[in-house]
């Protein structure tokens, strides 16, 4: 495992429980859900937009450009983009990352 320190837990709280961070050139979306911290690639696999709308009740994140929706625990696309309703969802998932709180800072396992 290669844990990389990102931002403080306070920054996540100040951002409403969701934040995008840059880790070694990868933009990672981090959200605090009902079952802990989750991280996934923050760049939508459809049009390369940054994800931005975390829905805690469904544990999903929505792309702000075209509405594609991804599970934060698996990265699986569960709703296609509105402009491409026939997109091959099984091929458009996102990489997930382990995230932890280490002494008040969020760390992401980049392996």
Curated annotation (Swiss-Prot):
Primary site of residence: cytoplasm
Matches recorded under InterPro entries: Rieske_2Fe-2S (IPR017941), Rieske_2Fe-2S_sf (IPR036922), SDX-like (IPR053457)
| Listed SUPFAM superfamilies | ISP domain
The coenzyme or cofactor needed here is: [2Fe-2S] cluster
User: Record's superkingdom?
Assistant: Archaea
Q: Which PANTHER family match?
A: FERREDOXIN-RELATED, SULREDOXIN-RELATED
- What protein family does this chain belong to? Belongs to the SDX family.
Alphabetized UniProt keyword annotations: 2Fe-2S, Cytoplasm, Electron transport, Iron, Iron-sulfur, Metal-binding, Oxidoreductase, Transport
Q: What's in the GO CC field?
A: cytoplasm
Molecular-function annotations in GO: 2 iron, 2 sulfur cluster binding; metal ion binding; oxidoreductase activity
The record's annotation in CDD domains points to:
Rieske
Q: Which Pfam families match?
A: Rieske (PF00355)
The record's free-text note on cofactor binding: Binds 1 [2Fe-2S] cluster per subunit.
**In which residues is [2Fe-2S] cluster bound?**
44, 46, 63, 66
Q: Where is the Rieske domain?
A: 3-108
What name does the UniProt record give this protein?
Probable sulredoxin
Concerning PROSITE patterns, the annotation shows:
RIESKE
Q: Tell where it localizes.
A: Cytoplasm
Q: Does the keyword Transport apply?
A: yes
